[in-house]
Amino acid sequence: CIRDRRILIQGKNGSGKSSLLKLLLKYPIEHTGTVTSGSGLVISYVPQDTSHLKGTLTEFAKVHKIDESLFKAILRKMDFERVQFEKDMKDFSAGQKKKVLIAKSLCEPAHLYVWDEPLNYIDVYSRIQIEQLIRQFSPAMLLVEHDVTFQKEIDAKVITL
């Protein structure tokens, strides 16, 4: 069982960390070799890029068919103020947008949670909150991240490319 297992991929810029994730997600990128995954494997993905986020959190939850109450409860655990729930996400900071994607991911039923640099734009306090959420939800995860403290706190096995 891979539940509660976390693998963190590290490596220098350009070593292929994000490309590896994209191959797993079946993105059409040039590669050699064969990539196979189990049939019916459901993956929840948090990309590096947050620039596409716009609209209210309520609209976002409806579009992505996630439980709005759970979504907002997770955001509250990451220090979102209730007043932010009605604001347009295009006005959110980069860190707030990253939290939206993390909360969305944790609301999605999946076999594997793939997060590409989830701590970009995240302050230390929020990092600790994210660590607590990972421990609470216990998802099987594949992450690209450079933060050694984070790796230790979520008890992730490290693979270096």
What is the predicted role of each segment?
Residues C1-D4:
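Conserved small/polar residues in nucleotide/adenosyl-binding loops
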Residues R6, K12-S15, S19-F71, E145-H146, ...:
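ABC ATPase nucleotide-binding domain signature region
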Residues G11-G16, G95, D116-E117:
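Conserved phosphate-binding and hydrolysis motifs of nucleotide-dependent enzymes
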Residues T36-G38, S105-E108, L133-F137, Q151-K152:
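Conserved catalytic network of the ASCE P-loop NTPase/AAA+ motor domain
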Residues P47-K104, E108-H111, E117-N120, I128:
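ABC-family P-loop ATPase nucleotide-binding domains
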Residues E81, F150-Q151:
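Short glycine/serine/proline-enriched coil/turn segments at secondary-structure junctions
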Residues N120-L133, T149:
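Conserved D-loop/post-Walker B switch-helix segment of ABC ATPase nucleotide-binding domains
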Residues P139-V144:
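Conserved H-loop
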